[in-house]
């Protein structure tokens, strides 16, 4: 994943994205291919396409979020690798994983 081996799948993704109506984001969404916030639908489509085979710039993304004043990063989905990486990137940041009902309650308490 996130390698040139994904290029064929990325081309299929590009076709699907071209047929998808995207609304302007209501909140800033940072993409990991450019470490940038995109507002334009075509720029968002292009970033999503390139993210499929481009390198993940996780450290830079975390630093960019921190520069925007973000102190808590919540990883949603199976696993907790990214939450652990957040803490290793900067111990002042809080990283948490949300992947089941128990961790949902933990995240609610963390953000309360």
Please tell me what each predicted stretch does.
Residues 1-76, 80-82, 105:
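Acyltransferase
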């Amino acid at each position: 994943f996130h390698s040139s081996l994904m290029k064929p799948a990325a081309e299929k993704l590009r076709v699907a994205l071209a047929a998808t109506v995207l609304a302007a984001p209501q909140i800033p969404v940072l993409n990991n291919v450019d470490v940038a916030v995109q507002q334009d639908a075509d720029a968002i489509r292009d970033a999503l396409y390139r993210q499929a085979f481009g390198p993940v710039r996780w450290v830079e993304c975390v630093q960019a979020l921190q520069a925007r004043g973000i102190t808590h990063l919540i990883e949603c989905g199976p696993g907790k690798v990214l939450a652990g990486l957040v803490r290793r990137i900067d111990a002042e940041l809080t990283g948490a994983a949300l992947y089941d009902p128990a961790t949902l309650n933990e995240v609610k308490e963390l953000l309360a």
